[in-house]
Amino acid sequence: MTLVLTIGKIADSGLRRILELTFSSIIVTKSAGVSGAMDLAHGRPHRVNSKTPRNTIQQSERKLRQYLLYFSKQDVGKAAGVMAQPVMGDARALPLNNDVVDLIVTSPPYANAIDYMRAHKYSLVWLECSTAELSRKRATYIGAERIAVQGGPILPESSERTIPAPTELDSTRARILRRYFSEIAQSISEMFRVLRSGRAAVLVVGTSTMRGLDV
């Protein structure tokens, strides 16, 4: 608590964000975190009484040193005329012009594997995000369960054949799956729009099952 309160008092917004990133990264981990929980990163948290939480200050210092090393390497890229610039946006409506991207490397969210907001909330609540705000954000995630799809792009036949199958078992899950496919289609359409002709898009996708069905 002392650490996060101290970070919140830092006036320099850039420094504060780096420290918030550091703090978040030592909470949401698979196993080597500073709490008694396991598998926070995969959204399946459970307490393990035999686990000894790691020292918060030591872990923060270790992570911060890693980040400072990464940031120092930006000078190498700058000297070569190459700089990374993070841009916040929505994959379904990219804030980019047509034909401006040379390479896309991404791993889309899974249809039924990880509850991303459930994983994120353990650090976001510490960083003073309210549960109401988290709920609003969750509703905007790709494939979110709260909002039904209205319209959306026409799906490939293979996707349409997959969707009715879960309906007999769970109509709610079928609607969630339709929304997921619809929004992934929007994302892929945006990738096609911004990618230059002849350039590559690499999508890493693993197996996902819903009610025992491969989707």
Model-derived features: positions:
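Acceptor-substrate binding/catalytic loop of class I
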Residues: 173-182, 204-215
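SAM-dependent nucleic-acid methyltransferase catalytic core
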Residues: 2-105, 111-117
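Short glycine-centered segments of the SAM/dcSAM-binding site in methyltransferase folds
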Residues: 18, 199-200
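Helix-to-beta-strand junctions that scaffold the AdoMet/dcAdoMet cofactor pocket
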Residues: 194-197
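SAM-dependent methyltransferase catalytic-core segment centered on the flexible catalytic loop
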Residues: 110-190
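A generic secondary-structure signal
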Residues: 6, 190-191
